[in-house]
Each structure stands twice: as structure tokens, then as C-alpha cells.
């Protein structure tokens, strides 16, 4: 898939679903791909691929499962492949907003991993730049984008920091997008910011991202 990226500016909400339908059956572990919890039968989205001590993990939302749950990915032919087991899950919610919502799935077969965003800029795959923290996001107030298996790509203006440190921004998201990557973009570079956690039911374009910089730093994880 060659999904050409166009910079989105202003206060408008951008949404593109059709071009990202391949995320439903990607046959590989890539940001935004659908991952099915084999115990629950429900699905979320791959966030970022991280590494620690030579092992690779999917960083996704904690509410997508519990420790010990297996997750699978479907290929274009409809075959399901178990890709790993959740080794860490924490979810603390406050109404519609998760105070803390992070999970790690240990990847069984690193050969299935394509850690790059499936976006292209001027016919070159978009470069994943350095992870940025909440202070950077507050200073630059960039437009944020999220990818997920349910609704594809959506971008909108950054709104602010929630009471418990979550990042609030405007975009379109539905159940199934949870856990997917959230990033800022500039000139063909994507700056990882967080993962999709949820949204406000009474104000559906307000979305919630869990910041990831401190989690990665504290845990000794490196983004691939």
C-alpha cells in the first residue's frame, strides 16, 4: 500500500478510512493493525513496537486485555496468526477517560514486525522521528494524528493535558481503534506522542491519548 500523506492544517478534523482498510487484515505486526484478543474475541489496534533486552513488544492500550491473554493478527487470506501474549496490563479509568491505560504484548515472531507507519511522504515512507514528551506537545501544540484498524487515519488540533496527564485532542475514533499510535507530523516525519485510549461520549471529537515518553524511559524500552 502506498498511502500518500498530505499535511493537514488549520482547525479542521481530517479522517480517511477507505485507504486504511488493509489494517484489518495486514498479515504483519505494524502500527494501527487490528489485533484480536483470542480470549475475548474483541479487537484493538497495534500501537508502537518497542524493544527491551532483545525482546520486542506491542505497546497498546491496557484495557484491551489482561496479563496472559493471547493476541492474533489476520492476513489478507483470512488466516489468523497468534502473534504474542500480553505480559503487562494496567487500566485505571475515570468516567470516559482512562487515567492510566497501557499494555505490552510480547511478540513471538519478530519476523512479522514492520515497525514503520504505513504512510508515505513524496513517495518515501514517512520517517518515525524521536519520541516527544508532554512538555514538547504543550510547547508546540501540534496537530495530532491517530491510526487504527476501525476507522483508519484521523487528525485534528491538540487541545491540552487532562487532569491525570492524558493528552486531549480532536479526531474521529471508535472502539477497535484503541491502542493505536498517536503522533504529530511535520515535513514527512512522524513524532510519536502516545497511544489511543478513548474519548468523551458527550463530546465525541475529543479524543484521549496516553503519553508514552515517560513510560518508555522508566521501563527502559526503545521504540523501533
Where do the protein language model's features map onto the residues?
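Terminal presequence/propeptide segments associated with secretion/organelle targeting
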Residues: 1-74, 150-152, 163-164, 170-171, ...
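Poly-acidic low-complexity segments
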Residues: 4, 99, 109, 192, ...
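Serine endopeptidase catalytic core focused on the charge-relay Asp
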Residues: 29-163, 184
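Generic structural signal for well-ordered, non-membrane alpha-helical segments
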Residues: 98-100, 175, 205
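Active-site donor-binding loop signature of nucleotide-sugar glycosyltransferases
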Residues: 107, 197-198
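Hydrophobic alpha-helical segments and their boundary regions
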Residues: 130, 168-169
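Catalytic nucleophile loop of clan PA
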Residues: 172-195
Amino acid at each position: 500500500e502506498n498511502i500518500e500523506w498530505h499535511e493537514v492544517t488549520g482547525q479542521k478534523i481530517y479522517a480517511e478510512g477507505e485507504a486504511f482498510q488493509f489494517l484489518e487484515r495486514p498479515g504483519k505486526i505494524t502500527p494501527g493493525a487490528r489485533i484480536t484478543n483470542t480470549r475475548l474475541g474483541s479487537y484493538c489496534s497495534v500501537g508502537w513496537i518497542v524493544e527491551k533486552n532483545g525482546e520486542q513488544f506491542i505497546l497498546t492500550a491496557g484495557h484491551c486485555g489482561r496479563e496472559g491473554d493471547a493476541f492474533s493478527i489476520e492476513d489478507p487470506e483470512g488466516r489468523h496468526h497468534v502473534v504474542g501474549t500480553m505480559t503487562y496490563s494496567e487500566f485505571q479509568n475515570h468516567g470516559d477517560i482512562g487515567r492510566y491505560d497501557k499494555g505490552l504484548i510480547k511478540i513471538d515472531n519478530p519476523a512479522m514486525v514492520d515497525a514503520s507507519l504505513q504512510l508515505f511522504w513524496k513517495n518515501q515512507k514517512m520517517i518515525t522521528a524521536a519520541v516527544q514528551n508532554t512538555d514538547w506537545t504543550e510547547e508546540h501544540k501540534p496537530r495530532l494524528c491517530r491510526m487504527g484498524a476501525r476507522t483508519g487515519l484521523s487528525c485534528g488540533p491538540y487541545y491540552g493535558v487532562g487532569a491525570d496527564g492524558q493528552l486531549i485532542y480532536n479526531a474521529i475514533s471508535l472502539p477497535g481503534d484503541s491502542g493505536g499510535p498517536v503522533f504529530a507530523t511535520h515535513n514527512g516525519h512522524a513524532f510519536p506522542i502516545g497511544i489511543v485510549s478513548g474519548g468523551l461520549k458527550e463530546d465525541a471529537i475529543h479524543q484521549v491519548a496516553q503519553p508514552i515518553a515517560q513510560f518508555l524511559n522508566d521501563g527502559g524500552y526503545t521504540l523501533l
